[in-house]
């Protein structure tokens, strides 16, 4: 087994080799909790959830840490607008974030540290940087990192200092020695949360938080650091500078994290999703209209490093494909029930290999689609199933569930999933499920009375509204086209 990942630091695909055999330490930058999570968060955290699932399925003991930033300028601004305590506001939106992640089927990290609970560690790390000459306190209560002291500052982002200086500036009231320097500690301001420090009361800057929490919960160096590609600069660039300067004499980026992985953006009509453009969707906006597993399935259809376009149309198509997968699993489990165990289908190992190759989920879904086509052909073949055919169907169903467990899909009873997906689709189309059920009952009565003209008329009327009836041994069920 060899797992290959695209490493942002080296811009190459590399074999993922943990520092300690059999164990892997992963840190993912979590959300700044000042509002409900958006589709970009859904994409990001589904990606890293699949990474964790696959690494564990491959036998690695993964320690997964993802933080909450609950002390930040945006949180303070939002809290002031609402007349609310900043920490309380952040806690409320952290709870909402958990609800959204649960709806998407994401596993909880092993540790979820919060900035507000790690102030002593942050202060100690800043003091260490000052002691080592990488940070300075100009005397106004702020502390800054001296960027030019760190020789590999632009290595992750592939930027040099000359390029960066053109866009750098010193804000009024700042006491930076260099426009490139960034704040590690900010002096207290009225109405803001603040903590004691050697430089006076204040609060941490954004970047130092993750460095301190990574070191406390994973040590240094760690194996893998991940997040959205918008964090490459400045956040992850600054994390490297802080963490390496505090813990290593070699001053190489690998002394903090051996590998760096970043996921792409969610776009709307080829533009990055943003509130200013009016194309912003929260996870809750989408889950009010679509099933959570369908959204997850949709997100897995694009390689994690690529940007992709979101629309209701493509999500509805993903929902339809997921329903088809569940229909096939239902048939395979029903027809293969009680069959003697068969060998694991070849598609399962092919799926593992695709995930080993930089977590290629679109390729996995393509492999699964091929296998489902074969399973459908076998399940729909007329006549009684042989013992061998039943065993093949049972093996397919187990294989589908195994691949699904790594992707975080196909984990519900088919009837439950199909009903949930159908009901969301019906609601979007303005179809009343109760009315459909009454029409089905009326059609059943017409058929019992041999009034087939009436039966066909009811069926055709429902079909015209996008409702497809399916007659089976257990009665009539329905779905939305």
Swiss-Prot record:
One of its GO terms (molecular function) is zinc ion binding. Binds 1 zinc ion per subunit. GO terms for cellular component: cytosol. Its EC number is 6.1.1.16. The keyword Protein biosynthesis applies. A motif ('KMSKS' region) lies at residues 272-276. Its main location: cytoplasm. It is found in: Cytoplasm. Keywords: Aminoacyl-tRNA synthetase, ATP-binding, Cytoplasm, Ligase, Metal-binding, Nucleotide-binding, Protein biosynthesis, Zinc. InterPro entries: Cys-tRNA-ligase, Cys-tRNA-synt_Ia_DALR, Cys-tRNA/MSH_ligase, CysS_C, Rossmann-like_a/b/a_fold, tRNA-synt_1_cat_dom, tRNAsynth_Ia_anticodon-bd. CDD domains: CysRS_core (cd00672). Zn(2+) binds at residues 29, 210, 235, 239. It catalyses: tRNA(Cys) + L-cysteine + ATP = L-cysteinyl-tRNA(Cys) + AMP + diphosphate. A motif ('HIGH' region) lies at residues 31-41. Its cofactor is Zn(2+). GO terms for biological process: cysteinyl-tRNA aminoacylation. ATP binds at residue 275. Monomer. HAMAP family: Cys_tRNA_synth. NCBIfam families: cysS. Belongs to the class-I aminoacyl-tRNA synthetase family. This is Cysteine--tRNA ligase.
């Amino acid at each position: 087994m060899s797992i290959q990942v695209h490493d942002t630091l080296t811009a190459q695909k590399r074999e993922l080799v943990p520092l300690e055999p059999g164990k892997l330490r992963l840190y993912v930058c979590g959300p700044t909790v000042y509002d409900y999570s958006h589709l970009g968060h859904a994409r990001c955290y589904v990606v890293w959830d699949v990474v964790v699932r696959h690494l564990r399925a491959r036998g690695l003991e993964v320690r997964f840490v993802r933080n909450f930033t609950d002390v930040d300028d945006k949180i303070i601004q939002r809290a002031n607008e609402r007349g609310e305590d900043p920490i309380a506001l952040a806690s409320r939106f952290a709870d909402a974030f958990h609800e959204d992640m649960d709806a998407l089927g994401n596993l909880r990290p092993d540790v979820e540290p919060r900035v507000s609970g790690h102030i002593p560690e942050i202060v100690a790390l800043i003091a260490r940087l000052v002691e080592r000459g990488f940070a300075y306190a100009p005397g106004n209560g702020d502390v800054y990192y001296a960027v030019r002291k760190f020789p590999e500052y632009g290595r992750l982002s592939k930027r040099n200092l000359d390029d960066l200086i053109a866009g750098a500036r010193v804000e009024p009231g700042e006491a930076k020695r260099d426009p490139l320097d960034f704040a590690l500690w900010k002096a207290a301001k009225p109405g803001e949360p603040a903590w004691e420090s050697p430089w006076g009361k204040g609060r941490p800057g954004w970047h130092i938080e993750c460095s301190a929490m990574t070191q406390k919960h994973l040590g240094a160096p760690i194996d893998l650091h991940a997040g959205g590609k918008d964090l490459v600069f400045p956040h992850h660039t600054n994390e490297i500078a802080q963490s390496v300067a505090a813990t290593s004499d070699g001053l190489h980026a690998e002394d903090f994290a051996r590998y760096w992985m970043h996921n792409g953006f969610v776009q709307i009509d080829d533009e990055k999703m943003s509130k200013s453009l009016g194309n912003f969707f929260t996870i809750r906006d989408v889950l009010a209209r679509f099933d959570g597993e369908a959204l997850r399935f949709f997100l897995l259809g694009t390689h994690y490093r690529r940007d992709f376009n979101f629309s209701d149309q493509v999500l509805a198509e993903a929902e339809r494909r997921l329903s088809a997968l569940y229909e096939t699993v239902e048939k395979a489990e029903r027809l293969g029930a009680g069959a003697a165990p068969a060998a694991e289908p070849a598609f399962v190992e092919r799926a593992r290999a695709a995930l080993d190759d930089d977590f290629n989920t679109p390729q996995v879904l393509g492999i699964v689609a091929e296998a489902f086509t074969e399973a459908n052909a076998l399940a729909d073949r007329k006549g009684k199933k042989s013992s061998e055919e039943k065993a093949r169907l049972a093996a397919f169903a187990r294989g589908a569930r195994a691949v699904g467990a790594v992707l975080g899909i196909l984990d519900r009873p088919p009837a439950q999933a199909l009903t949930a997906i159908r009901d969301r689709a019906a609601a979007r189309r303005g179809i009343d499920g109760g009315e459909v059920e009454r029409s089905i009952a009326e059609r059943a009565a017409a058929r019992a009375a041999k009034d087939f003209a009436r039966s066909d008329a009811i069926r055709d009327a429902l079909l015209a509204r996008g409702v497809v009836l399916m007659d089976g041994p257990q009665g009539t069920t329905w779905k939305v086209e």
